[in-house]
Every structure is written in structure tokens, then in C-alpha cells.
Design a protein with these regions (language model features):
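A short acidic, helix-capping loop that chelates divalent metal ions and anchors anionic groups
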Residues: 57-63, 161-162, 301-302
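A glycine-rich helix N-cap at a beta->alpha junction
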Residues: 72-88
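N-terminal catalytic cores of NTP/NDP-binding nucleotidyl/phosphoryl-transfer enzymes
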Residues: 7-72
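Classical nucleotidyltransferase
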Residues: 96-214, 304-317, 322, 328, ...
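Glycine-rich, highly charged phosphate/nucleotide-binding loops
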Residues: 68-76, 100-106
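Phosphate/ribose-recognition catalytic cores of enzymes acting on nucleotide-derived substrates
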Residues: 197-340
């Protein structure tokens, strides 16, 4: 999949089938739209192109009221590639784009910049300054300028409309199974493993210098307001052949010293329950990991001192092991029933 920053690019000369949106989370509704776009593009012999925005337009207009982020740009692009998208155009959402008229958006960006021949949009799609452009305007312009326009109605699961807002609601309330149902996969965060304070390896260590305590794999979340936060049962992918069971903290770590320079930064800190020997030595630093958040244990807590924090982490690890054991037992019972 090719990625372009902006629409004025010498390699964006081929006519395309296009859809436009924020695609936060790339949920099942997005996936259905992309499948429809891919089918139409194949029929017409066109590449599948997606135009998205960074930052989210609502972060530009009202940063204090902007929605929490489900996925980073990295994770969004990864999921778009999995959906068979050929090209993604990432438009920086700045003043010029915010003030552009709907007519100029069609003429300058869609026609001149992206060479559209077919455009698929959602039933609530709006564009241009003041959100004046809609499906009817786009369809009329297509008839006059030589490109086809179609729209897709809302996608529903169990009678409920699938949307990024619904995913955010499930994540904010810790309903991870509901979020996975809407996403079509477990909610996950990926990124490079980065160095932290290395405080975790001291907590619960067998001796002050042993470094065998609750060491963590740390990933930065690029947005200050993630859709989920708290303590989670997780699986870590990408560092070993098999996924690693663990427990993770996603948030700002309120138990850190107020003077700590890292306090307030959003991190995903994952403690692997059973560290492989090679990973325990080299720590996975610099590698890309994907962490699936499977079950929420509780919100972030502020502990009164390191001994209390150590006891809290130990309890979280025990609860995570119990959750995995319960899931394994349920899977085994289901397998037995299927064989009968």
C-alpha cells in the first residue's frame, strides 16, 4: 500500500475509485464500505484509494471537545492495508482545508488532484467550509464532471449502528468484548518498544539489584486522549513466535512522583506474565509490538507509595492469570461439545 502526504503528488496521476473519511478504528462499518469500494474498483479496473485526515477535523475546530482517539495513524494505516486498500492520501487538516469551499474541494482535490472516477461515501458524509457539501451536491457534480457517486447506508451489528462513536463508548466503559464485536477484532495498540524509567523491574524484585520485578514493554500512544484507559489483560504480538500473555496499564500512571518528567504522558506499559529468556535479556527495545487489550480489570489507581503499588500489580497479575485460565477452560469445553 502506498501512502501520500497531501494530494499534490506527481505519482497521483492515475484515475481511481475513492472513499473519504476519518476511519478512526477502521471498524466493521468501514470494512464493509472498503469491501464495496474494492469490488467496484475491480469491476472498473481502478486502484482503491482512501483519503483521510490528520488531525481529526474536530481536533482542529474544537480541541477541548474533540473525540478520544481509537487508533493512531500507524494503526489506522495498518488496518486499511489489511482491507485491501492500494493507496492512502493523508490530508493535513489545517486552516486552508477548513476554509475551502465544497465546490473547490470537488474541483481542486477530487478532480484535479486525485483524478476520481468513482466516489463512495457514507450516508452522513459532509465536506467543505461550514459542512455545506453533502451527497446530493457531490452526486450533482459527478453528473456534470464525469465521475460516478454512490453512498452506503449505515452498517449494523445486532440491530445497532456501527460507528466510531459506538466503539469509543464501549472502550471508555471497559466493554472490550463489545468493542471487539464492533471492530471485528480485539482492540489493539502498536508501536516501537521504548525505554522507560525501568522502575517496574525494581518493584517486587528478589533483591535490589536483581532487576527481575515487574518489568514492562512500553509503547507510546501518540494522542493525549486515548479511547480506553486503565488496567487490562493483554496479549503481546510481534516479539516472539507465539503471543505473550500479560497485564498492562494504559494511561498516565498517577502513582508516579508528581515531579517525574514522564508523568502525564500516555503510555501503554505491558508486563509479560512469563518472560521468555531471550526477551528478558534484550527487552524488545526498538522492535514493533502489537498489544491486544482483551479484558479490563479496573481503572487506573493512585497507590500510596511503592509497596502498595507493588501489591496492586501483583494482584493484577494474579487476576490476569485467572482470566486466561478461565478462557482456556471455556475453549476446552466448547471444543469437547463440538466433538460430541
Amino acid at each position: 500500500m502506498r501512502i501520500f502526504r497531501g494530494y499534490r503528488h506527481r505519482d497521483l496521476v492515475e484515475p481511481c475509485a475513492l472513499t473519504i473519511g476519518n476511519f478512526d478504528g477502521v471498524h466493521r462499518g468501514h470494512q464493509a464500505m472498503l469491501a464495496l469500494l474494492r469490488s467496484e474498483a475491480q469491476h472498473r479496473g481502478l486502484p482503491v484509494r482512501v483519503m483521510t485526515f490528520e488531525p481529526h477535523p474536530r481536533e482542529y475546530f474544537a480541541p477541548d471537545r474533540a473525540p478520544a482517539r481509537i487508533s493512531s495513524l500507524r494503526d489506522k494505516l495498518t488496518e486499511l492495508a489489511r482491507c485491501g486498500v492500494d493507496e492512502v492520501v493523508v490530508l493535513p487538516f489545517r486552516a486552508a482545508l477548513a476554509q475551502q469551499s465544497a465546490e473547490d474541494f470537488i474541483g481542486d482535490i477530487l478532480l484535479e488532484g486525485l483524478q476520481v472516477r468513482y466516489v463512495l461515501v457514507g450516508d452522513d458524509f459532509r465536506f467543505g467550509a461550514g459542512r455545506r457539501g453533502d451527497y446530493a451536491m457531490l452526486d450533482e457534480a459527478g453528473g456534470a464532471m464525469g465521475f460516478d457517486v454512490a453512498r452506503m447506508n449505515s452498517y449494523e451489528v445486532h440491530g445497532l449502528r456501527v460507528s466510531s462513536s459506538a466503539v469509543r463508548g464501549a472502550l471508555s466503559e471497559g466493554r472490550m468484548r463489545d468493542a471487539a464485536d464492533l471492530l471485528g477484532r480485539p482492540y489493539s495498540i502498536s508501536g516501537h518498544v521504548v525505554h522507560g524509567r525501568k522502575l517496574g523491574r525494581e518493584l517486587g524484585a528478589s533483591s535490589p539489584a536483581a532487576g527481575d520485578g515487574f518489568r514492562t514493554l512500553n509503547l507510546r500512544f501518540s494522542h493525549p486522549q486515548p479511547a480506553a484507559s486503565g488496567i487490562f489483560v493483554v496479549q503481546v504480538h510481534g516479539l516472539t513466535a507465539a503471543p505473550l500473555a500479560g497485564v498492562a496499564n494504559l494511561g498516565v500512571r498517577p502513582s508516579l512522583d508528581p515531579a517525574d518528567v514522564n508523568r502525564g504522558q500516555v503510555l501503554l506499559e505491558s508486563h509479560v506474565l512469563d518472560w521468555p529468556a531471550d526477551l528478558a535479556v534484550e527487552g524488545g527495545y526498538g522492535k514493533i509490538a502489537r498489544v491486544d487489550l482483551l479484558h479490563k480489570l479496573h481503572d487506573e489507581l493512585k497507590y500510596d507509595g511503592l509497596p502498595a503499588l507493588t501489591r496492586g500489580i501483583a494482584q493484577d497479575c494474579e487476576d490476569a492469570r485467572a482470566w486466561f485460565a478461565s478462557r482456556h477452560s471455556q475453549t476446552r469445553r466448547q471444543t469437547t461439545r463440538d466433538r460430541i
